C-alpha cells in the first residue's frame, strides 16, 4: 500500500498541538528528530525533549491524505506556514517499522513491562506484555499511553472486572488490563487496522479469548467496571454523554490524549458523572481519572 510522508519543522513548544492534529487527521506513525536527524521517535517515560526545534515526520495512507489541506491545517495551528515542509510518496513498508530499532523494554508502575516482540523480558517474574503495534498507535512510549499504563498497573483488577478500552489502537491498554487481572475487555476502535493489531497482540499474549474487539457502537449501560479512553480531547468532550453512563456506579474511568490547556474543559464534561481526581501529568500531556457517582 503506498504511503505519503510529510515532514516539517516546528518549535518544541508547538509539538504537542501539531502531533495531536496529525493524529486527528489520520497519521499512522509520527517520528521526531532533532535538526541533525538523530531520531528519538517518541520520548520514553520521564524523558524530556531537549531541543528548541524538532522535525516531525508523519506517515499517511496516500489514498486518504490531502497534503495541501494538511499543510493549511498545520499553518492554522502554528499561526504561520510550516517551515521545512516536504511531501514524499513511499512505496515499501520499511519506514513503517523503523521505530522497532529504538523500541526497548519499558516498565510502567510496579508490575508491568512492555516488551517488543522477539526481545527477552528484563524481569521474567513481572507482568510482561509482548507488543507488535504494526501501524496502530500505542507503543507505550508516548506520554498519553504511558500515563494510562501506569494507571492500570495501580488498579486492583480481578477476574470479574469488566474493562473497556475505547480507542484501542494497538490494543496495548486492553492487553495490559487483562494481563494485570481483568477478566474481560471490550476494545473499541474505528480503524480496521487498529482492530486487527489489537486482536493479534491479544492472541500473542494469551488473552485473545478475554478481549472482544469491535468498531464504534453503543456501549451497554453501566456495563464497565473500568473504562480507559486514550483519544483526543475534542472526541472525549463530544462523547461524554455516551462514555459516562457505560461505567457502573463506583466504577473507574481514565481519560487521556489531553493537553494541559484542555484539562478543565474535559473535566467539566465528566464531573457531573464522576468524582474527578487531580490530573496526572507527563510533559505537556494529562490523564484525568474519576469514580462514577452513585
Swiss-Prot record:
Belongs to the methyltransferase superfamily. PrmA family. Its main location: cytoplasm. It holds the Pfam family PrmA. It is found in: Cytoplasm. SUPFAM superfamilies: S-adenosyl-L-methionine-dependent methyltransferases. The gene is prmA. S-adenosyl-L-methionine binds at residues 145, 167, 189, 230. Its EC number is 2.1.1.-. PANTHER family: ELECTRON TRANSFER FLAVOPROTEIN BETA SUBUNIT LYSINE METHYLTRANSFERASE. It comes from Alkalilimnicola ehrlichii (strain ATCC BAA-1101 / DSM 17681 / MLHE-1). One of its GO terms (biological process) is methylation. HAMAP family: Methyltr_PrmA. Methylates ribosomal protein L11. One of its GO terms (cellular component) is cytosol. It catalyses: L-lysyl-[protein] + 3 S-adenosyl-L-methionine = N(6),N(6),N(6)-trimethyl-L-lysyl-[protein] + 3 S-adenosyl-L-homocysteine + 3 H(+). This is Ribosomal protein L11 methyltransferase. GO terms for molecular function: protein-lysine N-methyltransferase activity. It comes from the Bacteria. It is an enzyme of class 2 (transferase). Keywords: Cytoplasm, Methyltransferase, S-adenosyl-L-methionine, Transferase.
Amino acid at each position: 500500500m503506498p504511503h505519503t510522508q510529510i515532514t516539517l519543522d516546528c518549535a518544541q513548544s508547538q509539538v504537542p498541538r501539531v502531533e495531536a492534529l496529525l493524529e486527528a487527521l489520520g497519521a499512522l506513525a509520527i517520528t521526531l528528530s532533532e535538526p541533525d536527524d538523530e531520531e528519538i521517535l517518541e520520548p520514553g517515560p520521564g524523558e524530556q525533549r531537549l531541543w528548541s526545534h524538532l522535525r516531525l515526520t508523519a506517515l499517511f495512507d496516500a489514498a486518504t491524505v490531502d497534503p495541501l489541506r494538511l499543510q493549511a491545517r498545520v499553518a492554522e495551528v502554528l499561526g504561520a506556514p510550516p517551515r521545512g515542509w516536504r511531501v514524499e510518496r513511499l512505496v515499501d513498508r520499511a519506514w513503517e517499522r523503523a521505530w522497532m530499532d529504538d523500541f526497548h523494554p519499558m516498565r510502567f508502575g510496579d508490575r508491568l513491562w512492555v516488551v517488543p516482540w522477539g526481545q527477552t523480558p528484563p524481569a521474567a517474574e513481572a507482568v510482561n506484555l509482548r507488543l507488535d503495534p504494526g501501524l496502530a498507535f500505542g507503543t507505550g512510549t508516548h506520554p498519553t499511553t504511558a500515563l494510562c499504563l501506569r494507571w492500570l498497573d495501580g488498579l486492583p483488577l480481578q477476574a470479574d472486572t469488566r474493562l473497556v478500552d475505547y480507542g484501542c489502537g494497538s490494543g496495548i491498554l486492553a492487553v495490559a488490563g487483562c494481563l494485570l487481572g481483568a477478566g474481560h475487555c471490550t476494545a473499541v476502535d474505528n480503524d480496521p487496522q487498529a482492530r486487527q493489531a489489537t486482536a493479534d497482540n491479544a492472541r500473542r499474549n494469551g488473552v485473545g479469548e478475554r478481549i472482544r474487539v469491535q468498531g464504534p457502537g453503543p456501549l451497554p449501560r453501566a456495563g464497565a467496571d473500568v473504562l480507559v479512553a486514550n483519544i483526543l480531547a475534542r472526541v472525549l468532550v463530544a462523547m461524554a454523554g455516551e462514555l459516562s453512563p457505560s461505567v457502573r456506579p463506583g466504577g473507574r474511568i481514565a481519560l487521556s490524549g489531553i493537553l494541559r490547556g484542555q484539562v478543565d474543559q474535559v473535566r467539566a464534561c465528566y464531573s457531573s458523572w464522576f468524582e474527578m481526581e487531580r490530573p496526572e501529568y507527563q510533559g505537556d500531556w494529562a490523564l484525568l481519572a474519576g469514580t462514577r457517582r452513585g
